Regions:
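Short, flexible loop/turn elements at secondary-structure junctions
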Residues: 24, 29, 77-79, 101, ...
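Short catalytic/ligand-binding loop motif for oxyanion handling, primarily in non-cytosolic enzymes
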Residues: 31-34, 80-83, 135-137
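Replication-associated primase and helicase/ATPase modules
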Residues: 1-2
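Conserved small/polar residues in nucleotide/adenosyl-binding loops
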Residues: 174-179
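SAM-dependent methyltransferase catalytic-core segment centered on the flexible catalytic loop
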Residues: 8-73
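Conserved Class I SAM-dependent methyltransferase catalytic core
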Residues: 54-106
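Flexible, glycine-/basic-rich loop-and-beta segments that form/coincide
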Residues: 113-172
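Short alpha-helix plus adjacent loop in nuclease-associated cores
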Residues: 103-117
Length: 179
C-alpha cells in the first residue's frame, strides 16, 4: 500500500462520518531544487517522510470538510504557489494569511533559517474558506496577521496558533501527516 493511500485511509478512518468546520494542516512538504533533486540538507537529515505535491493535493481533505469550513494551511515561503494549489485542490478559496515570525529567546529574529535568496525567519499560514458567506468569528476581525513566537524543534509550529485559530474559527481539526 502506498504512503498516500495509507495516509488518506488513516485520515478518513480518524474522521469517520464527522465533517469539520475548521481544519489546521501542516503537510510534510518535499523541497527540491531546479533539477528535481531533494535539497541536500533535507536529504541528509531525513527527519520524516515527505510527500510530493501531487500526493498532498490528493489527500481527501474535501471529504472531511463541512460544506462551510475554514482551512489553515502551513506552507514554507519557497513553496507558496504549491500551498495555494493545495488549498484549491482541497476545495478552499484563499482569503488571507497569518505570518509566523520566528524569534529567539531574546525576541530578535532567528536567523538560523535556510533560504536560497533570503534567510527565512518567517513561515506562512494560509487561510481559506469553503462555502459562501463563510466569515471568521468576530474576534478574528481584530486579530493582526502576524504572530511572533519562538522556534522550537524542527518543523514544530508554535502552540500559540491553536488558541488564535479557536478564537477565529469554529470546531478545530488538526491534521498533520508529519510527526
Amino acid at each position: 500500500m502506498s504512503t498516500i493511500q495509507e495516509t488518506s485511509e488513516n485520515l478518513l478512518r480518524f474522521c469517520g462520518d464527522q465533517k469539520y468546520a475548521t481544519i489546521y494542516a501542516d503537510p510534510p512538504w518535499r523541497f527540491q531544487n531546479r533539477t528535481g533533486k531533494v535539497a541536500p540538507e533535507h536529504k541528509r537529515l531525513n527527519r520524516y517522510e515527505t510527500m510530493e505535491l501531487e500526493d498532498i493535493m490528493a489527500l481527501p481533505v474535501a471529504q472531511v470538510a463541512a460544506e462551510k469550513s475554514h482551512l489553515y494551511l502551513w506552507v514554507p515561503n519557497a513553496l507558496l504557489p504549491d500551498g495555494l494549489a493545495v488549498m484549491k485542490a482541497w476545495g478552499f478559496e484563499y482569503k488571507g494569511n497569518i505570518i509566523w515570525e520566528k524569534v529567539r529567546k531574546d525576541g530578535e529574529p532567528d536567523g538560523r533559517g535556510v533560504g536560497f535568496y533570503f534567510r527565512n525567519v518567517t513561515e506562512i499560514l494560509l487561510f481559506g474558506v469553503r462555502g459562501g458567506g463563510n466569515r471568521t468569528l468576530p474576534p478574528a476581525r481584530s486579530q493582526v496577521n502576524l504572530l511572533r513566537a519562538q522556534k522550537r524543534e524542527h518543523s514544530r509550529k508554535p502552540d500559540e496558533f491553536i488558541p488564535l485559530i479557536e478564537r477565529c474559527s469554529p470546531c478545530l481539526l488538526y491534521t498533520s501527516p508529519s510527526p
